[in-house]
From Swiss-Prot:
Any matching Pfam family: DPBB_1
Signal peptide (residue range): 1-24
GO cellular component term, pick one: membrane
Organism: Arabidopsis thaliana
Keyword check for Cell wall biogenesis/degradation: yes
Entry-linked Gene3D superfamilies: Expansin, cellulose-binding-like domain, RlpA-like domain
Protein name: Expansin-B1
Entry membrane topology: Peripheral membrane protein
């Protein structure tokens, strides 16, 4: 699901007013959760799109065309609400494998959470379900059985969290369309390790103060202040284990909307 640029500032302003009016910043629902156990856990999986396709175009996390190119390409997956976490679970990586020994390989497939799916066939909110690209779903099969496994449609699987590893990539910040000196919205890309974000802060030029940004949807965060003065430093804190990273002056003073600015650092590619 893509939100039109004109809607994003409205969401950010609404959240800013809501939180300001409450007198305090409400705690993030999932921020204190630890990374799920690395043991294998049960779930179900389906697939969508073309048989050898990359799955969704865009998705509820807001990665847009990134999902159509490597390293995302064919590795994307929509996850049920229990893993999506209102968008805070965007970017998390999982290994998945199916159980039927007659068609399933022992090899696990790594996928990145880029979209939200329904809860699966049980329709229970706490049910864990993955809706994979056709290519990723087929890769769970033993050689020559990709078509057979896709014809099953629905599979019982095992899954576990795994560290995200974007080889040769550092964390990047995409400035969303519609951003101004009074409303700035950022999308986080290529986060190694846990992959998710629990909080995000920004620091203006010449300031020592870190200002909290608001989570608006998917992997998008925003700030309503003004006028904002770059260059901007950005501090990220992971959702699962509260690891922190600060990218100094990563967004230049002459920043423009729709541009992506890449840092020189990343989290360690471990959980």
């Amino acid at each position: 699901m893509q939100l039109f640029p004109v809607i994003l500032p409205t969401l950010c302003v609404f959240l800013h007013l809501l939180i300001s009016g409450s007198g305090s910043t409400p705690p993030l629902t999932h921020s204190n959760q630890q990374v799920a156990a690395t043991r294998w856990l049960p779930a179900t999986a389906t697939w969508y799109g073309s048989a050898e396709g990359d799955g969704s175009s865009g998705g509820a996390c807001g990665y847009g065309s990134l999902v159509d190119v490597k390293p995302f390409k064919a590795r994307v997956g929509a996850v049920s609400p229990i893993l999506f976490k209102g968008g805070e679970g965007c970017g998390a990586c999982y290994k998945v494998r199916c159980l039927d020994k007659t068609i399933c390989s022992k090899r696990a497939v790594t996928i990145i959470a880029t979209d939200q799916s329904p809860s699966g066939p049980s329709a229970k909110a706490k049910h864990t379900h993955f809706d994979l690209s056709g290519a990723a779903f087929g890769h769970m099969a033993i050689p020559g059985h990709n078509g057979v496994i896709r014809n099953r449609g629905l599979l019982n699987i095992l899954y576990r969290r795994t560290a995200c590893k974007y080889r040769g990539k550092n964390i990047a910040f995409h400035v969303n369309a519609g951003s101004t000196d009074y409303w700035l919205s950022l999308l986080i890309e290529y986060e190694d390790g846990e992959g998710d974000i629990g909080s995000m802060h920004i620091r203006q030029a010449g300031s020592k103060e870190w200002i909290s940004m608001k989570h608006i949807w998917g992997a998008n965060w925003c700030i309503v202040e003004g006028p904002l003065k770059g260059p901007f430093s950005v501090k990220l804190t992971t959702l699962s284990n509260n690891k922190t990273l600060s990218a100094t002056d990563v967004i230049p003073s002459n920043w423009v909307p729709k541009a992506t600015y890449t840092s020189r650092l990343n989290f360690s590619p471990v959980l």
